């Protein structure tokens, strides 16, 4: 996922059989935007432990994508509309991840002593 000041971010994929000895070329899968201005300025993201969800954050919110049950592969997740996940107050959101069991989302901001936020999934 590219980080851009304006316009859509691009989603790229590295082949699972990448070559450690040569240059690898990423495949562009999609353009990705969120409702924040300017397009979210995305700062972090994670794939859920079960491989069925993606969480992405910008400075203010998090956005979750859910893989449709009938999807043929994970790449189809990028066709879904992101749903806002409220994280509470963060100064400058920088990181977001799923808990090991996938039942919570953790987030934090940049700088020292930033709060560590936990949001339980419903």
Locate the predicted segments by residue.
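Sequence/structural signature of beta-propeller domains
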Residues: 1-122
């Amino acid at each position: 996922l590219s980080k851009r000041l304006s316009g859509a971010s691009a989603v790229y994929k590295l082949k699972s059989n990448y070559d450690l000895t040569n240059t690898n070329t990423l495949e562009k899968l999609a353009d990705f935007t969120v409702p924040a201005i300017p397009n979210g300025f995305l700062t972090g993201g994670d794939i859920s432990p079960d491989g069925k969800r993606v969480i992405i954050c910008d400075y203010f919110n998090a956005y979750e994508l859910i893989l449709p049950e009938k999807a043929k592969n994970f790449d189809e997740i990028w066709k879904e509309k992101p749903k806002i996940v409220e994280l509470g107050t963060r100064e400058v959101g920088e990181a977001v991840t799923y808990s090991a069991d996938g039942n919570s989302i953790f987030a934090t901001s940049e700088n020292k002593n930033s709060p560590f936020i936990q949001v339980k999934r419903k």
